[in-house]
């Protein structure tokens, strides 16, 4: 991923990355990618930065890129943790339903235990993956469209009702557009999928993230 292709707008107070800053599954190959991402992310002239890792970010999971290195660069790393900024409570969690052998993955039957840890008073929920049915459509191997978000996460979001939920993980592909912001009639929450590369075009920015105002 060439993060330098992203255009960071001026005048924003906080930038959030919701994971998959890297590509390699092998943590030893992943390490150099992650360190390059941190170098780039740290130079963004925005006063506050949050990073929630994704399933691709294996070098953090395996301890090759330690928390101290990230936070020493002015980046807040959230792994099932909260930070309060200007009175708003942000909760970051990296887990997604298991698919292959990646980091921070849990079987769908037990992943609700992770979501139970999301505080009821969360204002901004930062996950790596989407809730079921919201900006989570993709093509299955049989070329049929399927929704791959987490139903247990969707259930938890309806209870917590954060103002905003941020995620990535499921990319846009072919004629399906997942990157963007959506409001859903059954939720009081606004949803943002900030995946910046389309499936099949990894390394090429096809979406520049989302800019959202919240108070």
Language model: regions and residue ranges:
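Short, solvent-exposed loop/turn segments at secondary-structure junctions
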Residues: 2, 22, 57-58, 95-98, ...
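Core catalytic region of metal-dependent phosphoesterases/phosphodiesterases
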Residues: 2-85
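Short, conserved loop/helix-junction motifs that constitute active-site signature segments
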Residues: 8-10, 41-46, 68-72, 118-119, ...
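Active-site neighborhood of phospho(di)ester-bond hydrolases with catalytic His/Asp-centered motifs
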Residues: 15-20, 48-55, 78-79, 124-128, ...
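Active-site-proximal segments of metal-dependent phosphoesterases and phosphodiesterases across multiple
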Residues: 22, 26-33, 121-163
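Short glycine-/acidic-enriched loop or helix-start segments at secondary-structure transitions
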Residues: 26-28, 60-63, 100-102, 134-137, ...
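Binuclear metal-dependent phosphoesterase catalytic core
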Residues: 84-86, 155-160, 164, 171-215
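Binuclear metal-dependent hydrolase catalytic cores centered on His/Asp/Glu-rich metal-binding motifs
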Residues: 88-124, 142-155
